[in-house]
Amino acid sequence: MMRPSYRSPKGAAVDKLDIPQGTLDLMILTILAREPMHGYGISQRLAVLSHDQFRVNPGSLFPSLYRLEEDGKLKADWRATENSRRAKYYRLTAAGRRQLEQHRERWDRVCFAVTSVLEGA
């Protein structure tokens, strides 16, 4: 199955997007709300769900994961992966689910406001 790719309104291919500041936590929490996952899996899922528009490098992803874990939003434990390697799997805590709801509500409001401005211009 081919995934759709984004093209500009004139049909030209476009470069991949930088993840907007402040949205990485929202995307991490959203992905982990579905199932526990290790860092590489989170990175891969993000690429798939964004139709390959977002690629997060480990230098951005892992500090966010560590901070979310330190803040009590995630819990982690070591497990064997599908190929028998050990990896740290992250899962949401109750505080993480609350944070996700708050982030999501705020993001929906931002999208509504930006869309309103763009359509009203």
Regions found by a protein language model. Give the residues of each.
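Basic amphipathic alpha-helical segments that dock to polyanions
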Residues: L61-L68
